[in-house]
A protein has these predicted regions:
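Surface-exposed, glycine-biased beta-strand/turn segments
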Residues: 9-86, 95-98, 112-122, 127-128, ...
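Short, solvent-exposed beta-strand-terminating loops
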Residues: 84-100, 186, 254-267
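Histidine-centered catalytic micro-motifs
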Residues: 92, 143-150
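A structural signal for beta-strand and strand-to-loop patches characteristic of beta-rich domains
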Residues: 165-174, 334-350
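Long, low-complexity serine/threonine/glycine- and acidic-rich segments characteristic of extracellular
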Residues: 169, 184, 194-339, 372-373, ...
């Protein structure tokens, strides 16, 4: 697996770090972190918990957009560069004096504090490293910092760390926090159950290994929870680059290095919402579900799902990278084990004895009744006054 071309790009000398150029800097947020409703765009640069750091133009260009808002990016500048990219500087406390005066005049003219302006080309032109504003804590910021982005000509967000800024040091590989295997259809099983299973992990340095052989059958999906750290910072940042190999063959890759704002809400199908809702952590699905239109995946024709066959052994290696090329790995073995199916005796249920859940095209029924198991019983469903008879695909006695 060779790192993407963007990683440690060779054009690092054409862009300057916007805070304290040529000095050590620290980040509180990185590209692609999983937030509740979106992926984090760009990077968040620490300013020592203070307002007032000079913000420098990352490359020569001119201001194309100015926004003043009490939410979101707060006071923000957008600068177009000769290569067609746009840099974004958000949560500013002040703009450069000439911009500040222009904004104030327009606010008075329009009798509004919140304003969005589009200056003429070269009306506010700056050279590389010239000060364009002062860092702040405006808008939806939760603490003083500079939010910084680089966007391409289509306004897609690029990962700024792919520009090789030497001001940020990172020799720490990603850290694994959790791993799970999920059955993906009604015929699939993990440890003979139609349930998502958390896998126990052992760690040696940054090499991780599953403590148990995973017994599974049918189509299953892998899910990973972890974070990345950078030198000198306690923040838990996101893991953007993940690769899955099965018996030496690449099944899945993700590299969150380019992001379209129009697809941000698809994060809700990138992470397993049921786990986030009940347990809190946001795992990466290492497979692509129906309806997911995000563009940063490479998968097999199974969309990253594994088809586990009875008695076959699958050696799996999962590689996690950060933009600086640091790597950690997880190794596990999945062995195919056909399910031991048994069905519930058909009985009449009292309303207070049953519950049910529907996920996709699967109906799960829960009952507190204790009854004998028989192989050929059926289930009668009353749907809108019509009785439909079906045979359950799976039965689990949780009292056994």
């Amino acid at each position: 697996f060779s790192l993407p071309l963007g990683v440690l790009a060779q054009n690092s000398d054409s862009y300057t770090f916007p805070i304290r150029p040529n000095k050590s800097n620290f980040l509180s947020g990185t590209m692609g972190e999983l937030r509740s409703s979106h992926f984090h765009a760009g990077i968040d640069i620490k300013t020592g918990g203070q307002i007032g750091e000079p913000v420098h133009a990352t490359k020569r260009g001119y201001i194309t957009r100015i926004k003043v808002s009490t939410y979101g990016y707060g006071n923000a500048l957008y600068m177009l560069h000769p290569d067609g990219n746009t840099s974004v500087y958000a949560h500013l406390n002040e703009f450069a004096p000439e911009i500040q005066e222009y904004v104030r005049d327009e606010q008075y003219k329009k009798q509004t504090y919140e304003i969005e302006l589009f200056p003429q080309p070269y009306q506010f032109a700056f050279k590389t490293q010239e000060v364009i504003g002062i860092s702040g804590n405006t808008g939806g910021s939760l603490g003083p910092h500079l939010h910084f982005e680089i966007r391409d000509a289509q306004q897609r967000v690029l990962n700024p760390l792919h520009y090789g800024f030497k001001e940020v040091r990172d020799n720490i590989p990603p850290i694994l926090q959790g791993f799970a295997v999920r059955p993906m259809d009604i015929e699939a099983r993990v440890f003979n159950k139609y349930e998502r299973a958390d896998i126990r992990i052992d760690r040696t340095a940054f090499d991780y290994k599953a403590m148990d052989t995973v017994k599974a059958f049918g189509h299953v999906g892998l899910e990973l929870w972890g974070h990345d750290k950078l030198n000198g910072s306690a923040n838990k940042n996101g893991i953007s680059i993940i690769e899955v190999e099965v018996n030496g063959e690449t099944y899945y890759k993700q590299d969150i290095d380019v992001m379209s704002f129009g697809l941000q809400r698809h994060i809700l199908v990138h992470y397993p919402y049921d786990v986030k809702r009940t347990e809190g952590p946001k795992y990466h699905k290492l497979y692509v579900e129906d309806g997911n239109k995000l563009k940063f995946y490479e998968t097999t024709n199974q969309n990253g799902l594994l088809k586990i066959e009875n008695n076959k052994v699958y050696e799996i290696e999962i590689k996690m990278y950060d933009p600086y090329g640091n790597k950690s790995t997880l190794d596990l073995i999945i062995k195919g084990e056909a399910p031991k199916q048994f069905l519930q005796e058909s009985i009449d249920f009292e309303l207070d004895q049953i519950d049910y859940r529907i996920k996709k095209d699967i109906l799960k029924i829960y009952t507190s009744n204790n009854c004998e198991k028989e192989e050929e019983e059926e289930l009668n469903l009353n749907i809108g006054g019509t009785v439909k008879t079906i045979k359950p695909s799976y039965f689990l006695d949780e009292t056994a």
